[in-house]
Swiss-Prot record:
Alphabetical list of Gene3D superfamilies matching this protein: Metal-dependent hydrolases (3.20.20.140)
An MF annotation (GO) of this entry: metal ion binding
Alphabetized UniProt keyword annotations: Decarboxylase, Lyase, Metal-binding, Zinc
Name assigned to this protein: Decarboxylase macB
Family per record: Belongs to the metallo-dependent hydrolases superfamily. ACMSD family.
Length: 338
């Protein structure tokens, strides 16, 4: 099948060092062990030809107290991603990391964006759903970044991060056994997506191609509610039709979201997603292999009843990332090759 996995994380040595120098991930999730070989092994088990690697949250924001260290970490991560692609050009792509975003660091973020896309030939840029001290991605401070991304017609991979903290700057959890990635992350994705729509960011930057993690989180469920309530209550001039059109402009990956019911919601009859806007994702190595295997099985079950499995598995992603089209690269990677 030669899948393209657009939601596949790597953990560069520089990030491990930075992570271990801090209190850790404020979402409550642990840092798993990872090697390029472990990624290739997972890819082989699911006939995945290419993984687009990205750094999960909190990413360079783990060094948010030091703009210089955050920028240096972003550069190290991007050089590592470039190295992996050079060593395995058909197996690995990567989304570049940016420094922690604040109004003051936007210029350096734009510089890193240019370096990553022009010099390192990154496949796109990773952004997180919100940044402490600024807010969600529709904030006016981020406008210059979106303008540059739009000018370049770039691909942006949006990954959820920890929710806003309490007054003591301590992330709030439902209980100690429910780290935020379990149930909070999907709604964080919805929050930033709706913020991008209502702030006018989407309408002003129509050429950016945005991938939302985890099937768009709760956006497919809440989009119609938000579209109508906002307009009917006089809270926005965006008509419900325009709101829903913009909500459907996002690309949606299936990491931890490829169960039968969710696939029916996204790509079934009258599905939320636009044709060609649903992409395969695994969420390795943060999702256990056992969980990934279950979701691949559920996807197979759904597509056994019909639907364009090839488009979701690789076709839609190949349109976004032309360098990984099989016809461009000729050689087919054997499914059991590491």
């Amino acid at each position: 099948m030669n899948r393209i996995d657009v939601h596949h994380h790597f953990i560069p040595p520089a990030y491990v060092k930075a992570f271990n120098s801090t209190p850790g991930d404020p979402s409550g999730w642990h840092l798993p062990k990872w090697t390029p070989e472990s990624t290739l092994s997972l890819m082989a088990s699911h006939s995945t030809r290419t993984a687009i690697l990205s750094l999960t949250a909190p990413g360079t924001s783990i060094m948010s107290n030091s703009p210089v260290e955050s920028a240096n970490l972003a550069r190290q991560i991007n050089l590592y991603g470039f190295q992996l692609h050079q060593e395995n050009p058909t197996r690995f792509g990567f989304f570049a990391s940016l420094p922690h975003l604040t109004p003051e660091t936007i210029p350096s973020a734009v510089e890193e964006l240019a370096y990553a896309l022009d010099t390192l030939q990154a496949d796109g840029i990773t952004l997180y759903t919100r940044y402490s001290g600024t807010g969600y991605l529709g904030h006016a401070a981020f406008a210059p970044l979106w303008e540059e991304l739009n000018r370049r017609k770039a691909v942006v991979f949006i990954h959820p991060t920890n929710t806003a903290s309490d007054a003591q700057n301590k992330p709030e959890m439902v209980n100690p056994k429910l780290p935020q990635p379990i149930i909070d992350y999907p709604h964080e994705t919805c929050r930033t997506a709706v913020d991008l729509i209502t702030s006018g960011t989407i309408s002003k930057n129509p050429d950016v191609k945005i991938i939302l993690s985890h099937g768009g989180g709760t956006l497919p469920i809440l989009a119609t509610r938000a579209a109508n309530l906002l307009y009917d209550a006089g809270l926005t001039e965006i008509t419900p039709e325009t709101f829903l059109e913009q909500a459907r402009s996002f690309y949606l990956d299936l990491a931890l979201s490829g169960n039968v019911g969710n696939l029916e919601l996204l790509v079934g009859k009258n599905g939320f997603a636009k044709p060609g806007h649903v992409l395969y994702g695994s969420d390795f190595p943060y999702a256990p292999v056992e969980t990934i295997n279950k979701y691949v099985g559920m996807m197979e079950e759904f597509f056994a009843q019909g639907g364009d499995k090839e488009e979701v598995a690789r076709g839609a992603a190949a349109e976004l990332f032309p360098r990984f089209r099989i016809e461009d690269n000729k050689e087919m990677i054997p499914q059991n090759r590491l």
